[in-house]
Amino acid sequence: MTESPTTSPATGSGAAAPDSDAPPYRYTAALAGRIEGSWQDTWAKLGTFNVPNPVGSLAPTDGTPVPEDKLFVQDMFPYPSGEGLHVGHPLGYIATDVYARYFRMTGRNVLHALGFDAFGLPAEQYAVQTGTHPRTRTEANVVNFRRQLGRLGLGHDSRRSFSTTDVEFYKWTQWIFLQIYNAWFDPAANKARPIAELVAEFDSGARSLDDGRNWSELSAGERADVIDSHRLVYRADSMVNWCPGLGTVLANEEVTADGRSDRGNFPVFRKRLRQWMMRITAYSDRLLDDLDLLDWPEPVKTMQRNWIGRSTGAKALFAATGADGAALDIEVFTTRPDTLFGATYMVLAPEHELVDELVAPAWPDGTDPRWTYGAATPGESVAAYRRAIASKSDLERQESKAKTGVFLGSYATNPTNGKPVPIFIADYVLAGYGTGAIMAVPGHDQRDWDFAHEFGLPIVEVIAGGDISEGAYAGDGVLVNSGYLDGLDVAAAKEAITARLEAEGRGCARVEYKLRDWLFARQRYWGEPFPIVYDSDGRPHALDEAALPVELPDVPDYSPVLFDPDDADSEPSPPLAKATDWVHVELDLGDGLKPYSRDTNVMPQWAGSSWYELRYTDPHNSERFCAKENEAYWMGPRPAEHGPQDPGGVDLYVGGAEHAVLHLLYARFWHKVLYDLGHVSSREPYRRLVNQGYIQAFAYTDSRGSYVPAEEVVERDGRFFYRGPDGEIEVFQEFGKIGKSLKNSISPDEICDDYGADTLRVYEMSMGPLEASRPWATKDVVGAHRFLQRVWRLVVDEQTGETRVVDGAGRDLPTGTLRLLHRTIAGVSEDYAALRNNTAVAKLIEYTNHLTKEHRDAVPRAAVEPLVLMLAPLAPHMAEELWLRLGHTTSLAHGPFPVADPAYLVEDTVEYPVQVNGKVRGRVTVAADADRDTLEAAALADEKVLAFLAGAQPRKVIVVPGRLVNLVV
């Protein structure tokens, strides 16, 4: 064990005890700092929080089997920014530490570790500005984060920590990429299978090509094209979010609602580029359906359901003729096939692949001028319109009240009635949803009605019940003006018209999703290189696993080519393209030594976080990303514990709700592919998810709305002032999330210096429910510190430093103390297990105050030792120190946590309110097992009740056991 740092007086009082006359052994910031540093050193030396694995380098060396009762607790790992932590960051880390410490003390084998999500744009931008390698900056930031987190006393197994930028970590990120690349999704099996099995099926004739070609007659290149089109990772010429100001392509989730980059606030343009994509859409149904198996907050599940966006409807084909005279079919998806007879025009997304083929060379005679966008030809109008909408985000396009569009000069044929319908492009139709084309039914869709009204297009009623002259009617009714559907209700009409479309070969039933495939490439430097090379024909080839890792090379500078933020026509040029010696290589991929070029894109920052939970289970394994035995132990399904449908996964995952449709969806996708391929036993990465709230603080803005440093603001007479470069100005107070952007960050180092880490831990846990946001107030931290001082005084004499407890059996405690002790044990145990740390703190304060009041001279050991043990998850340093001073020679980190005696949880007496005609007029206390007659007699004998009755006799006495007595007069 350790020598107590309290054997010397608490010199240096710190902010929490400014009085120089304070007793020499008072619990002050200085003493807390010595205690905390000492115990952190002891934990590190003894490996207190090291947890064994079933197999591998972290398995017990003596062959001892690991305990069956395990618990895997995980935090969303931090990005190591240059600013370091603020007091909002530790909220979730402390909460999970309390949870893990509690269950560790109850005897469970607890895995709790923390790594760093270290790839990303900030380090790269710093490298661009300074010429410093991003790794240098990142590693320095990680060192600072580890220092700050270390001060908090988090009980992590430090052997399991890593950064996603570690070569030995991203080697396995690349390996998992190859597993996904070398897999395809078999719809019949509803799972991923190795691509080699697909090739074998084509070779054997068990599977035929969809286009009718003969596999055996295809060239090697044609076969490769077929196989590549089935892969779960593929290249596609797709519409992407191009940000010239950042020099890279962004995922949809990285673009703000107003069409700008989430980082840097640059304009973002829709542009067609050839990019790596991951076929996450193949898993839409499983991602959606398996949400029901997860213990996650319902709002997060709802966000994922909405993001996936499953819709049931029908596909319909509208025949058209291209500008060259070729016959074309325009495919639409609709959830309302019953309204097909009301389709009076079509709208395609401006980016739709058929637009250019459908543009007529000239305007048809009689074209309405409103349809031409003021251009002389359809081609000119389309080009002008595309330029006009290039910078609009998808959200802007859909929410815009002003309807704009351009007629292509061509017509399609409505498959239900054979009538011609003009074809438009308009920005409110998105290429990424459905087929990128809609049949417009203005009589029953308000957006279509608005567009038709703006452009003078026909509006036809096909469902009776509304007034379509005033607006679209979206309600139910019977079909009218719909031929063979007339008189049917909506449900019957949907069924009938879908059957007719199928019979005529012009459509079929269809399920569509909002979810799009995952854009998986960035034109940056600081990311995982792709394990892909290209031959002289530009065809991609996966590297052999033995060639991993593909390490990042040094480059002359780290910036992608940046463009004028408004230059929508610019093209990406990644930084890795500058490393020509690295890009151009000669390799033998099985057919002799040949020249190849490496892929110069890098993976997005989401790559490492899509699987990192698995690496915690086996962080030093050089043969696999994790041993199957270790994954099965820590993450495998446990139906006996969690039910027959348990998907497995991390037992508790805590992080922000802002990751609901990014990290969490991507991680689920990767995990399901690994499960399908037999690499993991769990179907889901995270069995249980909890979203912590935010810590908020006051921020201050000047008259222009710009934020000023909160710590430099002074208050006078209810107004706030800031002294800037031009003198003092008045600023205005608002409330917001703590962070760099609001200039209101408070470092945890500051609080640790002034009060100690245990005080910070107790304060943050006492502020409110974990899931709720809560206001930070530094002035209130002292309350948590005073509570810990009271606990300290129960054990330690502040004048002498001696222990001031008295021995004695627990049964010798006063009855009131015994009952409160066991109620506290029961309540705190339930609170810790349910992450209700704020109410646990309240119960501990109540019990501490009781001991302080009832045992002024000396506290019985039997009363105070359980308090120290209960305090340990919240304030572990102080608890360890007091445990040592109470004469124990081993750490309390592994328990025992006290257990409540049920005998002391039963109340001997119960207080009943006594009502007269429904209003409380008195209260009586009776034995808990009192019968009805005893309770009635006590109520009628109460002085206040008698005074109110004034001699009247109740006509009826109502007794509700355990709740109340009501006298009716």
From Swiss-Prot:
Entry keywords, A to Z: Aminoacyl-tRNA synthetase, ATP-binding, Cytoplasm, Ligase, Nucleotide-binding, Protein biosynthesis
Motif ('KMSKS' region): 737-741
Signal peptide interval: none
EC assignment: 6.1.1.4
Entry's Gene Ontology BP terms: leucyl-tRNA aminoacylation
Subcellular location: Cytoplasm
Region entry Disordered, spans: 1-23
Keyword Cytoplasm: yes
Binding site for ATP: 740
Gene3D superfamilies found in the cross-reference section: HUPs, Isoleucyl-tRNA Synthetase, Domain 1, Valyl/Leucyl/Isoleucyl-tRNA synthetase, editing domain
Class of this enzyme: ligase
InterPro entries: aa-tRNA-synth_I_CS, Leu-tRNA-ligase, Leu_tRNA-synth_edit, M/V/L/I-tRNA-synth_anticd-bd, Methionyl/Leucyl_tRNA_Synth, Rossmann-like_a/b/a_fold, tRNAsynth_Ia_anticodon-bd, Val/Leu/Ile-tRNA-synth_edit
Cellular component terms per the entry's GO annotation: cytosol
One annotated GO molecular function: ATP binding
Enzymatic reactions: tRNA(Leu) + L-leucine + ATP = L-leucyl-tRNA(Leu) + AMP + diphosphate
Extent of motif 'HIGH' region: 78-89
Family, as annotated: Belongs to the class-I aminoacyl-tRNA synthetase family.
HAMAP family: Leu_tRNA_synth_B
Protein name: Leucine--tRNA ligase
Organism: Mycolicibacterium paratuberculosis (strain ATCC BAA-968 / K-10) (Mycobacterium paratuberculosis)
